[in-house]
Amino acid sequence: MHVQELLFVAAILVPQCLRALRYSQGTGDENCETLKSEIHLIKEEFDELGRMQRTCNADVIVNKCEGLCNSQVQPSVITPTGFLKECYCCRESFLKEKVITLTHCYDPDGTRLTSPEMGSMDIRLREPTECKCFKCGDFTR
């Protein structure tokens, strides 16, 4: 491509890109938020020889990130594909450890365990307490 052609393409594309950028920044329709979600957790416990000792499960409420983030694709004379992509994803910005008690425990034969030491199991997991929009694929935070 000659210099004159590049200047012509740039003269046409740059104003369109700026309009697209202004439009995407001005919409304000991001709504990334922390929501409650019910999930079914199952945890198996094994002895040192790898034999299953018990299985515990429960339906629990945990936090999740959900929502929309502004993303855009705009023409570009610089990138090899001809488009510059800026994608943003709704993800956790802060995690907190939570202890959950699984209250339905069974032996390998499927018999319900009711003793205080075997009838329930505490597990730890990390759940989001805050969510916000981050550049997609950016795991450095």
UniProtKB/Swiss-Prot annotation:
Residue stretches making up the CTCK domain: 32-127
InterPro entries in UniProt: Bursicon_suB (IPR034441), Cystine-knot_cytokine (IPR029034)
Subcellular location: Secreted
Sample GO molecular function, one term: protein heterodimerization activity
Keyword hit for Ribonucleoprotein: no
GO cellular component terms, A-Z: bursicon neuropeptide hormone complex; extracellular region
Gene3D superfamilies referenced in this protein's UniProt entry, alphabetically: Cystine-knot cytokines (2.10.90.10)
Disulfide bond annotation, renumbered to this chain: C32-C90, C56-C105, C65-C131, C69-C133, C87-C136
Key words of the record: Disulfide bond, Hormone, Secreted, Signal
UniProt function note: Final heterodimeric neurohormone released at the end of the molting cycle, involved in the sclerotization (tanning) of the insect cuticle, melanization and wing spreading. Heterodimer specifically activates the G protein-coupled receptor rk.
Quaternary structure and partners: Heterodimer with Burs; 2 cystine knot polypeptides.
Protein name as annotated: Partner of bursicon
Provenance organism: Drosophila melanogaster
Lineage: Eukaryota, Metazoa, Ecdysozoa, Arthropoda, Hexapoda
